[in-house]
């Protein structure tokens, strides 16, 4: 089955990106990388990316919000 949206393709190759707030994103290899995001892992399968995220992403809370809470 062909996927019109590259973000939905389970057979696609994806980068793992991270922004300044410590949030992660899967990004299709064939798409232009967004500004403000750094490559954490080179393109790999969606399943491999999900395994990496499960092992490394501990919170959904952005870094700036966590720092604000700790300061109070």
Curated annotation (Swiss-Prot):
It comes from the Bacteria. Signal peptide: none annotated. Disruption phenotype: Cells lacking this gene are not able to produce enough enterobactin for efficient growth. GO terms for biological process: enterobactin biosynthetic process; siderophore biosynthetic process. Involved in the biosynthesis of the siderophore enterobactin (enterochelin), which is a macrocyclic trimeric lactone of N-(2,3-dihydroxybenzoyl)-serine. Plays a role in the catalytic function of EntF. It is required for adenylation of amino acids in non-ribosomal peptide biosynthesis. Belongs to the MbtH-like family. This is Enterobactin biosynthesis protein YbdZ. It comes from Escherichia coli (strain K12). The lineage of its organism: Bacteria, Pseudomonadati, Pseudomonadota, Gammaproteobacteria, Enterobacterales.
């Amino acid at each position: 089955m062909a996927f019109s949206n590259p973000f939905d393709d389970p057979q696609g190759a994806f980068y793992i990106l991270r922004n300044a707030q410590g949030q992660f994103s899967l990004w299709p290899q064939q798409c232009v990388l967004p500004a403000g995001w750094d490559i954490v892992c080179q393109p790999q399968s969606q399943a491999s990316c999900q395994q990496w995220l499960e092992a490394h992403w501990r919170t959904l809370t952005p870094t700036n919000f966590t720092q604000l809470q700790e300061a109070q």
